[in-house]
Amino acid sequence: MDCSMKKLTILDGGMGREVKRMEAPFSQPLWSAQALIESPEFVYQAHNNFIHAGAEIIIANSYACVPFHLGQALYDQKGSDLARFAAQIARECADKTSTLVQVAGCIPPAFGSYRPDLFEPKLGGIIFRTLFDAQEDYVDLWLAETICSLEELKCLQSVFASSTKPTAYAFSLNDDSLETALLRSGETVIQAIEHIVQSADNTNTISVYFNCSVPEVMAKAVSDTKAVLNQHKLDIEIGVYANNFTAIKSNHEANSALQSMRELSPEEYLAFAQEWHLRGATIIGGCCGIGPDHIKALSDWKASL
């Protein structure tokens, strides 16, 4: 096995379903922000659960710190403070562990997950900037999550232009497209990666992730990304963290109900992860419904490489 195949970083799993599993306060539309507001000890515990399972990067619990989940009034009053608190909790958990754990600041979708048709660039940029400013002092790297369109990507790039920290762009994929890797907008992964390549500068390290999509569509996205990067002779890391959901449709209403689960076992998820790694992914974790047991399976596998 060559050196590139031995390189692997373990990301954490899904915060929302983990705090729900622990019976923290959890309901729509607040989702994972409810524990942050009412019982933050559960957020500490969830981070620690993933760290103990072997996670080397943990993501701040700021995904739901947007008007879509908090409501406009609570967001205006506390959105920035909650995002800052989420980053502070993650920082504290990372610093208290005996192993090296990095904290990723989370920039989530501004208008709800999986709906590129609802994106508004001007207001989105303001929300992104608010969450960026709130977390900047506490994070080691940035992770823009569940990006569904090139329009959203471009808006995020303008926000991250002022940072010198490593930045990861995580795209959510069309769950029904197995032959062609598509963003939820219908734009191709190849188009997205070409845009990143053409717009990249040398001020900070860029990586490309794929998240919150079914595991079956990830391998093609990794292969397409690797092909574009090889064509441009670029060495950009690729990450994958899939969800444990059934397929999400294009008219999904993220606050209407909890998405149904499919209950992939740690062993089943690991089999997908091994394929992603073979195709070039070097950062692997889990999104919604992927818990500490799944992350431990990934960590144990890493130890065997």
Regions found by a protein language model. Name each.
Residues 1-305:
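Domain-level signal for soluble alpha/beta catalytic cores
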